[in-house]
Amino acid sequence: MLQKIILATVVAFVLSLASGPLFIPYLRKLKFGQKVREDGPKSHIKKSGTPTMGGIMFITATVISTLIFSHWNKYLAILLLGFLGYGLIGFADDFLKVYFKRPLGLKAREKLIGQFLLAIIISYFAQEYVGTEVIFPFLKTTIDLGNFYIPFIVFVIVGTVNSVNLTDGLDGLAAGVSFIVMAFFTMTALFLNNITYGAFSAALTGGLLGFLRYNRHPAEIFMGDTGSLAIGGAIATAAVLTKLPLILPLIGIIYVAEAFSVIIQVLSFKLFGKRVFKMSPLHHHFELSGWQEQNVVYAFWIVTLIAMFLSFYSLS
């Protein structure tokens, strides 16, 4: 199994890396460039026009590598449903922005309806395939959620998807953090001796590493919602199928911090007319506090690495 895990990682890495010189110029030719938010940090203005929808690179690499090294079964079908389903929602959002010049892409309501419907489908099949028990980290026990399972899992999936999306705001941030998170799920699958989860997680880990070659600062391409929603779907679905949704606030601590910074900022401004952060999501707050973009990214990577070791400890 270890050999297949390594090969799945390497093949996805090579495919993702090799697609860059072909895909990036093609997106430039199509003028599929990212529009930078006008109220964002001034240092980001120069990024306007950078090719987006780069998630297609590691999505394609991941799917090909997974199908080569994994066995087709109902668990893999659900993993790919979460990965490709949310990637498709992101693709529709990106395509409306860059092709039809619709600045906001899909309407928030349209996006949420799609996200919730997909989450309900995934949670239903997860309940059928793995039951309603989830592992409680640190306590080394399981909790049977019973009738609360589907509502809880829907919340976890939609929350994770949107939290990853919010994290994708600096060069290499979401890709690097998610690389570490997927490495955690790869090693977890290895301990479980499950090639289905292992091959998929390893392939996405390798695909993200290959993509980082072009997404690190200064980024040649952005993953877009195509990539960030797909990653969120993959992480959430992997956590659900391994009975580890409760590990997500720990291994995904950066995602949680980014999401809560937005929630706190909005609530604080609406209730008290004051902003807690200089700008949200959290990574922009650090930028406006004088941090270099690369230093924010490296710090968030390090925090995720620490969270990974704590996550392993919580399950040992």
Swiss-Prot record:
Pathway(s) the chain acts in: Cell wall biogenesis; peptidoglycan biosynthesis
GO biological process: cell division; cell wall organization; peptidoglycan biosynthetic process; regulation of cell shape
Entry's Gene Ontology molecular function annotations: metal ion binding; phospho-N-acetylmuramoyl-pentapeptide-transferase activity; UDP-N-acetylmuramoyl-L-alanyl-D-glutamyl-meso-2,6-diaminopimelyl-D-alanyl-D-alanine:undecaprenyl-phosphate transferase activity
GO cellular component assignments: plasma membrane
Entry-linked InterPro entries: Glycosyl_transferase_4, PNAcMuramoyl-5peptid_Trfase, PNAcMuramoyl-5peptid_Trfase_CS
Catalytic activity: UDP-N-acetyl-alpha-D-muramoyl-L-alanyl-gamma-D-glutamyl-meso-2,6-diaminopimeloyl-D-alanyl-D-alanine + di-trans,octa-cis-undecaprenyl phosphate = di-trans,octa-cis-undecaprenyl diphospho-N-acetyl-alpha-D-muramoyl-L-alanyl-D-glutamyl-meso-2,6-diaminopimeloyl-D-alanyl-D-alanine + UMP
Needed cofactors: Mg(2+)
E.C. number: 2.7.8.13
Matches recorded under PROSITE patterns: MRAY_1, MRAY_2
Region forming the signal peptide: none
Keywords assigned by UniProt, alphabetized: Cell cycle, Cell division, Cell membrane, Cell shape, Cell wall biogenesis/degradation, Magnesium, Membrane, Metal-binding, Peptidoglycan synthesis, Transferase, Transmembrane, Transmembrane helix
Enzyme class: transferase
This protein's record includes keyword Manganese: no
Membrane-spanning ranges: 5-25, 49-69, 76-96, 116-136, 141-161, 172-192, 195-212, 221-241, 244-264, 296-316
Location(s), subcellular: Cell membrane
Entry membrane topology: Multi-pass membrane protein
Family assignment from sequence similarity: Belongs to the glycosyltransferase 4 family. MraY subfamily.
Role, per record: Catalyzes the initial step of the lipid cycle reactions in the biosynthesis of the cell wall peptidoglycan: transfers peptidoglycan precursor phospho-MurNAc-pentapeptide from UDP-MurNAc-pentapeptide onto the lipid carrier undecaprenyl phosphate, yielding undecaprenyl-pyrophosphoryl-MurNAc-pentapeptide, known as lipid I.
The protein, known as: Phospho-N-acetylmuramoyl-pentapeptide-transferase
